[in-house]
A protein has these predicted regions:
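A cross-family "folded-core" feature that marks the main globular domain of proteins
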Residues: 1-283
Length: 283
């Protein structure tokens, strides 16, 4: 490992057989200079940033925030690899360190940033949210401060984003659309639903796929997959609700919801709420 750049005593960039890597370890760069050899045995953690853009963003971040935030983020990334089977992109280190530095400063000033998508995040990404709660514990262990539940939700999105091909703005747009749909459903059916039920989980999962398709990040829905075709006269609330959803998607996102998509949404609403909230159809 040849040192290319030193950020502080504990963090450096090295050339490792032609690959640029970020290495961390207590005192690994102390009294070291660019061009010198770094003993791999002194390195605790190695991160690979695959693009020049990621490397550039890391360098800007390393110059702008205290190294403790990068080190805490490194610990969190290690936890994610260790405690989950998710394929986590190491570039999450950059986004996490940046977010944690801002989140901790907000908490220290007594400022809580609202997260209007928290409910949807907790239910759509249960595994990732649990990992984000572990991340909050690590932040507390190292920095002696608890971040809010809203911040845990934002950390969840960073974890989800590190496992998906879509960028962070697409992810936020997807969750925002799901929230809009749930708000519309709530207007029609009220809040009398078991949000921990398997039926609700299936409904949320379908909304996730629906949102991805509506926003152009997923394939089309085939109505041949429907277990049963339903009649508008039998389920007026469900059809009216879906009409409202389709109009919202068209107005807000300029996307026409197909008949197949509408039929599947109706089926899920009827399965979950029944006729006017009473008589359901079999899942």
């Amino acid at each position: 490992m040849i040192i290319k750049r030193i950020y502080n005593n504990n963090i450096a960039m090295v050339d490792d057989d032609g690959a640029e890597r970020i290495v961390l370890g207590r005192g690994i760069a102390f009294q070291k200079h660019r061009g010198e050899t770094l003993d791999p045995a002194s390195v605790d953690k190695v991160f690979t940033l695959d693009s020049p853009d990621a490397i550039s963003r890391f360098e800007k971040l390393a110059k702008s925030i205290p190294s403790e935030y990068i080190e805490v983020s490194e610990e969190i990334v290690e936890m994610l690899h260790r405690e989950s089977d998710l394929e986590i992109d190491d570039s999450i280190l950059i986004a996490l360190a940046d977010h944690i530095s801002l989140a901790v400063e907000r908490e220290r000033r007594g400022v809580t940033l609202a997260n209007p998508m928290l409910f949807e995040i907790k239910h759509l990404y249960r595994e990732e949210y649990a990992l984000a709660e572990r991340a909050a514990e690590i932040i507390h262990e190292h920095l002696d401060i608890w971040v809010s539940e809203s911040e845990v939700g934002f950390i969840t999105l960073h974890i989800v984003n590190a496992t998906m091909e879509q960028d962070s703005q697409q992810l936020i747009q997807c969750v925002s659309l799901i929230k809009d749909i749930l708000d519309i459903v709530g207007e029609v059916y009220g809040d009398d639903v078991d949000t921990e039920s398997l039926g609700y989980e299936r409904f949320l999962r379908h909304l996730q796929f629906f949102a991805e398709r509506a926003l152009g990040t997923g394939g089309e829905q085939d109505d041949a997959d429907l277990p049963v075709l339903l009649d508008r006269a039998d389920y007026p609330d469900a059809f009216a609700c879906v009409d409202h959803i389709a109009e919202h998607v068209k107005t807000t996102y300029h996307v026409n919801v197909t008949d197949a998509e509408k039929s599947y949404l109706v089926y899920h609403l009827v399965t979950l709420f029944g006729t006017n909230g009473r008589d359901g159809c079999d899942a």
